[in-house]
Amino acid sequence: MATKATSSRTTGRPGVKKRIRKIFGDIHEVVQMPNLIEVQRESYEQFLRSDPATGYVSGLEKTLRSVFPIQDFAGTASLDIKEKDGYVLESPKYDVNECRQRGITYAAPMKVTLKLATFEVDAETETKSLIDIKEQDVYMGDIPLMTENGTFFINGTERVIVSQMHRSPGVLFDHDRGKTHSSGKYLFAARVIPYRGSWLDFEFDAKDIVNVRIDRKRKLPVTALLHALGLGDEDILHHFYDTVTWARAEGGWKVPFVLEQWRGSKPAFDIVDAKSGEVIFPAGQKISPRAANKAAKDGLEALLIPTEEIFGRYAARDLIDESTGRIWIEAGDEVSPENLDLLDKAGIDNLDLLDIDHISTGPWIRNTLKADKAPDRDHALADIYRVMRPGEPPTRETAEALFDGLFFDGDRYDLSAVGRVKLNMRLGLDCPDTVTTLRTDDILAVVKELVNLKDGKGEVDDIDNLGNRRVRSVGELLENQYRVGLLRMERAVKERMSSVDVSTVMPNDLINAKPAVAAVREFFGSSQLSQFMDQTNPLSEVTHKRRVSALGPGGLTRERAGFEVRDVHPTHYGRICPIETPEGPNIGLINSLSTFARVNKYGFIETPYRKVVDGKVTKDVIYLSAMEEQKHTVAQASAELTADGSFVEELVSARQNGEFVMAPRDTVTLMDVSPKQLVSVAASLIPFLENDDANRALMGSNMQRQAVPLIKADAPFVGTGMEETVARDSGAAISALRSGVVDQVDATRIVIRASGDIEPGQSGVDIYRLQKFERSNQSTCINQRPLVKVGDLIEKGDIIADGPSTEFGELALGRNVLVAFMPWNGYNYEDSILISERIVKEDVFTSIHIEEFEVMARDTKLGPEDITRDIPNVGEEALRNLDEAGIVYIGAEVHPGDILVGKITPKGESPMTPEEKLLRAIFGEKASDVRDTSLRLPPGVAGTIVDVRVFNRHGIEIDDRTRAIQNEEIERLAKDREDERAILNRATFNRLKDMLLGQVAAAAPKGIKKGVEIDEQVLADVERHEWWKFAVADDARQQQLEAVKAQYDTAVKAIQEKFEDRKEKLERGDELAPGVLKMVKVFVAVKRKLQPGDKMAGRHGNKGIISRILPQEDMPFLEDGTPVDFVLNPLGVPSRMNVGQIFETHLGWAARGLGKRIGEALDAWREANPNPEAGQPPEAVRELLKEIYGDNYAAEIDARNDEQIIDFAQSVRLGVPMGSPVFDGAVEKDVTDMLRLAGLDESGQVTLFDGRTGDAFDRKVTVGMKYVLKLHHLVDDKIHARSIGPYSLVTQQPLGGKAQFGGQRFGEMEVWALQAYGAAYTLQEMLTVKSDDVVGRTKVYEAIVKGDDTFEAGIPESFNVLVKEMRSLGLNVELSSLDDTDDDDGLAEAAE
């Protein structure tokens, strides 16, 4: 089987640790996969930046220019944007990291250059003359910026704007599928959807009248709309119908012979040739196409038709007696014997009739015209006005203004370029896409197409076709929101212009940018599409950015979305993943883009195809949207090709109009580029996806996004080859921006000296800061580790550091573990998992979670709160972890209830108890006037303090702890500065030395004579910084020296300025919320080991809960004594139909066996060559690697030297990494070949032994290496207990849920259970003292304190609430208590 190489760059240069993954796959991809987060970045780039070179205008500029110029109501002033460079985005005040730490928005201030022009208007001639123009830069608020990874920092949290899928603007034709009318006939409808503005609906009703609705209001006959457009009755009829002239002749009427009309018909009368009088077609006989063609060929031109046949036809024109003005017949009137007599008398021999035959052309528009009550344009406009503004009396002017504003005014109605393109395509129009309002021709064309559908011509549209749905990405969503804000601002500006003297003000005085800023803030802060980024692991980040949602403003709602919208559609192929979508109410509404998909400029999703020319597949790749693909026949990526690109088979499996067909090879026009273009990123990470049931694959792709990053990441032995792409594009692993040499490496940063020519003004140093133990949005741990050593050569794009869940630049969500499929004492019943103690002991699945806690000291009415170590009534033991400032130390081990930050709050004076008085007498004031409001660690959290950040309000004196943190940060910045300077000096002075050597000194520093030839000794005698004082005789060289000096000075200055700027920001104080004096954030790292109750999963939708952790010695073990790690239930496979996991297990078993073989060969070589330098080369190891990896990797393995081969062999001794790409992966034969090569049984099964008895199990068991993930559903986060806690305000019942520290609900069914057992007292205490009997609760507490265990139940608070609710309904219900007497009189009295 031919295999393709992973990457041509894996040549083992020093420094780049990179695996070679053995990929099973025949298909070589001709096009590179687009960057996975390109959708986000490109969209926002188009919103922010115009490109004068190509003439592209950014979305932001388009929006600004659509609102400006703003004119006042009188027309005496106009506020406009400067024509060129109208706006500028300045550099942001804080960088991304500062925004994350300070909790602020990463944004750039926008300045717009506005011109205020004032005019004088001549009252008589109404001409304007310009008086004055004032220009000024106006601040228009901050525009949030996107980070390199496609996210936004809003108030310090990382957010993603999800793209929205909505109905494309344009025209859609549809019918009701016979559901509206009882007869079941189809009622056709057309809808013109604009980008913004009024919707226009045309529809047939049950009487076959064509109606129109504007904005889903009351319906009107369509002819009212056509009249309003200025068309008369005759114009309307002529537009929809042809005209036939009937001429009076002897014995009837003479009509032109139209071949198509008569072919295949059965006339009810004899058809006579008007010229010869012969009967050509007798009555009652079907006219065959052959006979009709013969008649036409014989020269038949006109037919003679009996007079009765004219009755029931419709006149095409008004016929008027010109002398008297009497109308004989109106256009559209039916011809009857009466009006035919009138025409006879008038001597009219020729009649123009509408060509309506009731078969291929129906009288729908004519009938509508007759049903229309409005005779002319004015009446039609008035009718439309009454529908749109019911209750207001129309005048001609208001009606005309309203109608023009509805569809023909660019400010109120916008089809957008997309809408115009769709309209043109559907209706066959030819109108430039700059015309974004409706035209009369458009409306006529829509009605004509609708009538054609009714007449049985053409097809209705499919709403769910991706040609009729488009994607709105970040840029467009923000553009729409910003326009809303600007329009609000425009109103305010107009009012301000009319209320002040415009000649005395500047643009700044008129503009209040608050509405625009508020619109942007609202969009990023609270829009349904602006979401808190899912940052569990790198895959979840990438998937979140590639998500496409049909929900959100202007989209669908969960409740209204039917089955069709959610379903997979043939046009999804290669555009939207058919697998990855949530389970539950959002299924099918939230989707993921496929791997190769991209969004075009119109917002349609495109997918790439290879062109097929003359039956040969070329390397040309074109991207097509669903509309463009319709006319093509597309072959599968797996179709077999010859060397020259021709198809091997005569019939090729292909797609045509959404159907799968076997097409002849010469009809194929396109071919897929890759088998994985069908699925999304997450689904493409599942090996053997083709062997899994789709429902399970859906769960698998969703659960990979919940995998928690572990302390040690393991790339899968069995992957798909996509792992590296995801790690790189997600930004989790750091790739080098420029090539160079590694200068310094430590845990927190990598310094690379750039090689090659450095552009002037650019630093020659790249410093990469690594994120160390930072908290993600989901509290998982973000930690990056360097992969390079000092002196390594780095190429641009190389992975230099691993991030969370990555290993050597590959995505690594879980661990490879040894699993056995067998039952074990019921501990794997119903998907439970039995695991070995080794997994816990060796921290295989241990993860670190970082929790953030914050406390604020505010200014209260009673005085300021204080963060301090001096807390009343707290012993020294509780304060052991706090420093002098009252803040916990970094590195302290903390447990639930421990104080993290000491805080005291002033409290009002209240009457003192004797105890308080005593305390006050002993300790003075402090004890009474403050209360302890310290930040304590909540239950269920225990760990180590990893970071503390203190924020102080500007102008407040800072404490020692804050100063220490600041100094530490400044030292770090200074270290960066010194490193950059040192590398800059080294590089510059080496270059300077090369330029000076051999030159003659025209000027020199002190102590060196002029005219001396500069050599090594001369330079050694002078301090380095004095070298600049040399001048050389060679003018060209002297100019070069001066250029280097200028570049050096600029670089030194830039480094210093950067340092000063950051230092100043640190010392400036922080922007805190109003009323907050000080804020402290404490980060606690929690180590979560695997324990029973944690959820684990594979990549095939196979999930389970850990039921028991078994000692290693009790686990089933292999023949060599190795105990297995996991025991899974084999019954979890057959009914779930996810057989991919078995293939993975077998191939993983082979990978482990091959790794063992390599390890043995390596150990044998080491034994034979104790001194590697003097010994034999490791040829046996090299040959074994070549045998395992196959011919495609031979060149790559040969290119490595002996040392690299040993390193390589060492790195794969635990298991050889393999890749099985989706739909093109390893087949059964490949798996058995690998098992054979590893020296293992081809069945993949082995004899296992019981760890407790040492006996072999009865039959062989499937054992292998499987990739297992630990999911973000940890038992520690879910387990919860409460004795007492908060109560609901009204009902006084305990709250619910862990977050509220609530209780367990004792519901209706639980009450029934206790009633059934007759446990009356238990039930009573459940419903009273343990719930909402307030008095009883207190009494029970007091009794328990005194050691008494009796209690009395009182009245539950919810009863009182019920009584109050009944009273609010006007029912005076009172609860009367009686003394314990048995006489009925008492009851009677009470009742009275």
From Swiss-Prot:
Entries under PROSITE patterns matching the protein: RNA_POL_BETA
Enzyme Commission code(s) on record: 2.7.7.6
Gene3D superfamilies in alphabetical order: 2.40.50.100, 2.40.50.150, 3.90.1100.10, DNA-directed RNA polymerase, beta subunit, external 1 domain, DNA-directed RNA polymerase, subunit 2, domain 6, RNA polymerase alpha subunit dimerisation domain, RNA polymerase Rpb2, domain 2
Catalytic activity: RNA(n) + a ribonucleoside 5'-triphosphate = RNA(n+1) + diphosphate
InterPro entries: DNA-dir_RNA_pol_bsu_ext_1_sf (IPR042107), DNA-dir_RNA_pol_bsu_external_1 (IPR019462), DNA-dir_RNA_pol_su2 (IPR015712), DNA-dir_RNAP_su2_dom (IPR007120), DNA-dir_RNAP_su2_hyb_sf (IPR037033), RNA_pol_bsu_bac (IPR010243), RNA_pol_bsu_CS (IPR007121), RNA_pol_bsu_protrusion (IPR007644)
GO molecular function: DNA binding; DNA-directed RNA polymerase activity; ribonucleoside binding
GO cellular component: DNA-directed RNA polymerase complex
Keyword Transcription: yes
One Pfam family matching this protein: RNA_pol_Rpb2_7
Claim: Cell division is one of the keywords in the record: no
GO BP field: DNA-templated transcription
Keywords for the protein's UniProt record, in alphabetical order: DNA-directed RNA polymerase, Nucleotidyltransferase, Transcription, Transferase
Functional note: DNA-dependent RNA polymerase catalyzes the transcription of DNA into RNA using the four ribonucleoside triphosphates as substrates.
Assembly description: The RNAP catalytic core consists of 2 alpha, 1 beta, 1 beta' and 1 omega subunit. When a sigma factor is associated with the core the holoenzyme is formed, which can initiate transcription.
The family this protein is said to belong to: Belongs to the RNA polymerase beta chain family.
The name this protein goes by in its record: DNA-directed RNA polymerase subunit beta
The encoding gene: rpoB
